[in-house]
A protein has these predicted regions:
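Short pre-catalytic strand/loop immediately N-terminal to key active-site residues, enriched for Gly-Thr
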Residues: 113-125
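Hydrophobic alpha-helical scaffolding
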Residues: 10-11, 124, 137, 166, ...
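Glycine-rich phosphate/dinucleotide-binding loop and adjoining beta-alpha-beta core of small-molecule
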Residues: 1-116, 185-186
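Short, charged, surface-exposed loops that flank catalytic or proteolytic processing sites
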Residues: 72-80, 141-149, 167-171
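Charged C-terminal helix
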Residues: 157-191
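Feature representing long, continuous alpha-helical segments
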Residues: 83-86, 131-132, 178
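A short structural micro-motif
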Residues: 76, 154-157
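Short, small-residue alpha-helix embedded
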Residues: 68, 123-154
Length: 191
């Protein structure tokens, strides 16, 4: 029994993966985070399976993945990001964490916008790292939407802290792990 499962990172896109996602959606009763190949699998084989879910679902697409999930162009999404995101989250009763220069987190009714991340996060592995943060914080309180937003805020703060020591162009996503305790302490001290 796991309180939260994250899947999709590097698993590939296939009908077998779709069957696994479908099984989890219909049988797992806690929180399921779907990222990367998991999102692309839903886009290819049918996003409507989300309507059959028994669990809480967090989707973490970047704009390209979201365009594939919704069948809406990237340009259209960028023009109407809040409206399209809220409608999608409401329609599928999920939390959507739409990653871009800013990150929009919504459940369709309430939304957060994270603007504190640096461009240094726009590189391979950053989405996986963020999914890991969300995985770790998803059940810290009863407010799942807030927990996802807090994960994004921490992710942004990690990039800010790391940039004080490491040039933005040299920063590796794995470098962020060195700053987690410092950022968490800073947040706790700010209370």
């Amino acid at each position: 029994n796991y309180d939260t499962i994250a899947l999709g990172m590097g698993i590939g896109i296939s009908e077998e993966i779709y069957k696994i996602i479908k099984y989890l959606l219909q049988n797992y009763t806690h929180t399921l985070i779907i990222d990367a190949d998991g999102l692309n699998t839903l886009a290819k084989f049918g996003v409507s399976v989300l309507k059959t879910k028994k669990c809480k679902v967090i989707l973490t697409p970047h704009i390209g993945e979201f365009a594939r999930l919704t069948n809406v162009s990237k340009d259209e999404i960028l023009k109407n990001e809040l409206e399209i995101s809220e409608e999608f989250a409401m329609n599928f009763d999920c939390i959507l964490c739409l990653k871009n220069n800013t990150t929009l987190i919504t459940d369709g009714y309430n939304s957060y916008l994270n603007i504190n991340a640096l461009p240094s996060l726009a590189k391979a592995g950053s989405g996986d790292f963020l999914s890991g943060l969300i995985l770790g914080l998803a059940n810290k309180s009863e407010d799942l939407l807030f927990n996802v937003a807090a994960s994004n805020f921490i992710f942004g703060l990690l990039s800010v802290e790391a940039s004080k020591d490491i040039d933005e162009n040299s920063l590796l996503i794995t470098d962020l792990t060195k700053y987690i305790s410092k950022v968490i302490r800073r947040i706790k001290d700010a209370k």
